[in-house]
């Protein structure tokens, strides 16, 4: 009898044991050679497929984070700006000027309607003195600054601010306190 390598084996049990050992040895070598490489190959394929997607998602996440940080900064800045606007006296003066301008416009409109009704009553003759004065009022230039509360004419904006703070600031604070009390009563 000749063995797998060309050696002659004399005993059948030894041949069986040699065959069994060689099979186990070949199987072990096969597992050592192939199994880790297959596992590493699978891991490598998984990384190759998923890594670009993960990198893209991470870059997208950083971009979103930068946008959110920018929007948060803008929002905080806007909130601080709006809160600081509550303490600017110019807006109070502008509000009073707007109220005064609206009241003046209503008075002018009422006067214009009154003149028209007088014209209709008098007839369609020559222009009356009221119509001429109306034109001169509309085209007259105004120089300086006018306090909307007391209609005092001042020469500069700084004078107007000082006048407003000294004369009308306490009245405005009192009015604000009254409005706050009224709002608290409603709650």
Swiss-Prot record:
Q: Where is the signal peptide?
A: none
Q: Which GO terms describe its cellular component?
A: BORC complex; lysosomal membrane
Q: Which Pfam families match?
A: BORCS8
Task: Give each disulfide bond as a residue pair.
Answer: none
Residues that span the membrane, as ranges: none
Positions of region (Disordered): 165-187
Q: Which domain of life is it from?
A: Eukaryota
- What does the function comment of this entry state? May participate in the coupling of lysosomes to microtubule plus-end-directed kinesin motor.
Q: What is this protein called?
A: BLOC-1-related complex subunit 8 homolog
- Whose protein is this, by species? Nematostella vectensis (Starlet sea anemone)
